[in-house]
């Protein structure tokens, strides 16, 4: 049974907050040491060809940067790596982080003090002791050669070093080595954890370099004028800038999640062994997106970012160099873990209360599911008894007062189960919360019990032939006639209108209002009201959607929800609930991915390497979408609140199309058959890859198209309107 345990996590939350503040303070300290505004040891990326790595190494040692490994302070390492990335600086901080944890105590102390300047290599020297190309080895005194498989390694002195000119600046280096001065042996599993930390630091550095390019490009869109207006006002620039922002946020989010998983696993062995997969997912996404981020920024900056006086040209080199370092690993590591090892995407921890509630939801779903088929009526009745349809309502209104995270859990798990009570949940999220805020006592008395029981059969009357994403342009009108309103107009693409008892209807009550959204009012209208005509249509997905005509429909003023001309407030208040609902798309994609993996695991060795690489990229993007949904749920105000929701929506929607297409192509013609048919790989009742493909476009165009969402992202970044 659900319990409100609001005080049980306060100490953990406070501890996490304190740790985050400490990491931020450390990053600020690192930035201060590096410098800014053209002054300091390495103030910006323009210092890349002339910066003194040796002097910076000495300063870093004085500040204790090389001792992070002795504390296994991965979050601090990643924070410092980001500051280095912003400045295109390849200080081998992560190499020292690993070395100090595997070398004998006396040598480790010398690394921490900066006396030994160590770089890592997973490649053994050639017969003559030569080794290269190596990153950040210009002033290295030693190289630590490690074998990931065996856990063995050796520390060799650097006899000489020579620059190898090319893409990387500072240049990569080829060294010659002397005989080993120390042998090391580490448990292979432990060594993999340490080397994963190094990979994660490089990934963070690469994303930070790309993000700095993006930051410069965004600023450029506001000040650079062409054809009489800022270039940020052009739609093409807005779309590209928003797409780049999506990649930056997604890659950053996965790096952050990998850090959190690794720290949790280090603190508690009972959490499982998922950190390696979390790192692989982050690295996969960084490899896929980092250089695209750089190119996108370069395209926006134009010629100004193409010359060496500008940071972008040096950041461009850093992004590409770091990507090459990361890409040396297996491109299909994620998919091999999922397909060959039977692993699942790392679970997202929403906190003790939410995760405890997740187990309750799992138990109820299992109780009402037989042979993979859920009994929707039995589940609805039990959820009504438990009060779950009013989970997030205040206790004073008959709800359970649950946290947003617990509401997310319920919505996610129901969607992962195939959405057996979708309509009831939609009524809760979209109607229930709005009625609580704006409904009259009579409306609350009439409708809240139905919603609480999961029996409210409604449809949403928003879209019109000329009003889709631009809801403020709706034309269906309501004219007051005494105590009644007369409604005339047409609504399009109204899902479930043919079975609805009521429509949540947005109409124009002031045709002359400025701005346009100021003249909209909401009504809750019975669908059997005279003058309403429903015309069903079968969608590409096979679902029924309807055109609904309103011809002289008379409704009493008591059907109005909220103030006259105040409907926009009622509509936008529902966005608070939308933060919870948006997790449903990502949960559906996870369900579809798991269904695909179930089929592929029957013959894992028949999956081609190229298909595994493709699957790895899709899995990484799905995990990023899931992480961003959680961030959107928790973002209440500020720039992130305006950006992260649309970012998660765009990423999830486009992923739905790509995952559905990949599923069909990986399985061949059999994958396009309905489950249960003789040649289908799926039993009856299982996920239909055919249906997933046909419904996928709606995730991109429904509820505000992705193009519009990217425009919202661009404006949140400060770009002007077209």
Where do the PLM segments sit?
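C-terminal helix-coil-helix/basic helical segment that borders enzyme active sites and/or dimer interfaces
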Residues: 2-6, 10, 38-47, 226, ...
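Internal helix-loop-helix
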Residues: 5, 13-16, 20, 24, ...
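A short core secondary-structure module
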Residues: 115, 119-121, 128-166, 172, ...
